[in-house]
Amino acid sequence: MNGLVRQRTRLARVRRIQHGLAASVAAQAAGRVQMLETSRERLRKLRGELRPVEGPTTGAAMARMGELAMRLDSARYNLGPTIDSARSAAAAREAERRAARRDQESAEKLEAAALRVAEEAAEQRLRQAGRGRGSIRLHQGESE
């Protein structure tokens, strides 16, 4: 295996590792978006389930329920910018993953081409070595 093949093999291995890391980071970013969206949905459901108790109720209990409803709404609305930011970060990580995959595929093609050239060169050397030996044998046979 010549130097070019070793270099291309090493490059392909590095690109595979880089793609794996980029895919992991992209998956984490997508998971964060999913978690935030799930949290927002849970807050919406909690807010929807807040109902005043039937029967006599004190003003303090109504005030506490109103305060809780306001806090749930506020938390849900404040998740919007965070989710948008997480989505843009996830999109950026996905773009990085695609670029890493493209680099990996390119490195694998270069590695395959280098292997093919090395194999052809080895076959060529074998053919030339075979011809050289045959002509030596003919010369030895003629001198006998």
Roles of regions detected by a PLM:
Residues M1-E144:
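Charge-rich amphipathic alpha-helical interaction elements
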